[in-house]
Amino acid sequence: MQKIAFHLNSLQQGGAERVVSNLANRFAKEGYEVVIATEWYGTDEFALDQKVRRVHVGLTKEDENRSRISKMLRRIWYLRRFMKKEKPDVVVAFTRGVLYRALAAGIGTGIPVVISVRTDPVGHYDKKADKLRIPLLFPHAAGCVFQTEGAKAFFAPYLQENSRIILNPLNPKYVGVPEPAVRTKNVVQSGRLVDFKNQPMLIRAFLKVHEKHPDYTLKIYGPDSKDGTKEIL
């Protein structure tokens, strides 16, 4: 295998985006040809090694006035066109909607598509639309990556048997960081303010801890996803 393609919506800072940027940069340094296909360009994106190519496969300005179904089909077509032109040895897709798009685009191309489930399937892969798309598209996956046994167990046996559990990669720059001479009494959570990370539950739980340990402080770091979570907090 010499050429690896990653597909996700953008490289705007988030968990899946961080993993893709780290993997892409590392594979490039190892001598692989790496290309990342994204739907759009976000603000405050992760940096890529100069050896990593990025290709836009999202909608054009002319597509904005199309119907929802037409936009969905265009996204699949643009990605399929990218795959046939680039001819990667494998496509690795991250995040829920992207998985379906990549699998649909890859049908008949002969290019293996590996999908990566990054979130708790309960609440994210159990909606009516998922129950229709998963049986149609997931059998086409060349493999699946999960982060936990629980996530793996959610899916059908055929997918479990064709999967691996791989933890998030750790950037070497964070290894061996010296511990502070004096620890502060802070509980820190880092991540986007978004519904599935459930920061409201964290706050409710911390309030109970704070009753017994009033000298502790909770600090939450992360950008606003604009889904209403910030307002709830």
For each predicted feature, which ranges?
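A conserved mid-protein helix/loop that constitutes part of the nucleotide-sugar donor-binding site
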Residues: 17-22, 185, 194-211, 231
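Short His-centered aromatic/hydrophobic patch
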Residues: 93-99, 117
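Nucleotide-sugar donor-binding and catalytic loop/hinge architecture
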Residues: 1-3, 173-187, 210-213
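Short, structured helix-loop element that forms part of the nucleotide-activated donor/catalytic region
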Residues: 45-47, 212, 219-233
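Carbohydrate-associated surface elements
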Residues: 150, 169
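Nucleotide-sugar donor phosphate/pyrophosphate-binding loop at the beta->alpha transition
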Residues: 69-77, 109-112, 119-140, 146-147, ...
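N-terminal strand-loop element at the rim of the active site
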Residues: 6-14, 18-20, 26-66, 154-156, ...
